[in-house]
C-alpha cells in the first residue's frame, strides 16, 4: 500500500529546499524499513530546478537563481498552481526505472481522462502531453506534466510536476526540459476553466495508489502511448 501525504498547497506551499530535505529523510526511512512507500503532494513557491542533464543554454540568461538537483532531466520550473508529487517508493527487482516513470505517466493520463482531457506520451520524451498549437497556429505537442526521478538503494526520489492553474511567464526565461520544439500547457488552459492543485488531489490519489501498488507491473494507460526513453523531465 502507498501512503499519500499532502503537505502544503496554495498559501501553505513548501519551499523547495525544505521539501528536498523531507524527501531525503523519508527516503532514508523507506530504505531502512522504518516507513512505508509514500507520495508527498505539494506546491512550491516559484523556483527553477536543474537536473543532471541541464545544458548552460537552458538556464535563465539574466542570472536568476537555479537549484541544481540530483534527478534526471534538465531544467524546469515549479510554482503556484502546479501540483508536485514526490513518490518515495521501493522498486521491485529487477530494477526498472523506466517502468516506474511509465507508472507515473499512467496515473497522470488516467487523471486527465477523468477531466475529459486527452493526453498521451511522446516517443523519446518522458512526461505527459496534450495536443496544442504554436503561436503561428500549427499543431504541436504541449507538456502538461514533467517527470524526473532518481533511484538510490532501490528507492525513488523526485517525481512529477503537473500544471494545473499556473501562469506561464516563468517558462519564457528557460528552455523547459531542454525541449525547444514543443510548448507547455495546463489543465485549466486545456479545459477552459480553473482547476487548482487542491481540486486535482482527490482525483489523482486513487490513480497513484493503483499505479504504485502494482508491484512493478506497468498499468495500461487510458490514452495513446509510445515508448519512454528514460527517467528524465
Curated annotation (Swiss-Prot):
The record marks 143 as: Lowers pKa of active site Cys. Substrate binds at residues 71-78, 146-148, 159-161. It is found in: Cytoplasm. The active site is at residue 177. Its main location: cytoplasm. The keyword Glycosyltransferase does not apply. One of its GO terms (cellular component) is cytoplasm. GO terms for biological process: protein modification process. CDD domains: LipB. It catalyses: octanoyl-[ACP] + L-lysyl-[protein] = N(6)-octanoyl-L-lysyl-[protein] + holo-[ACP] + H(+). It is an enzyme of class 2 (transferase). NCBIfam families: lipB, PRK14345.1. HAMAP family: LipB. This is Octanoyltransferase. It comes from Clavibacter michiganensis subsp. michiganensis (strain NCPPB 382).
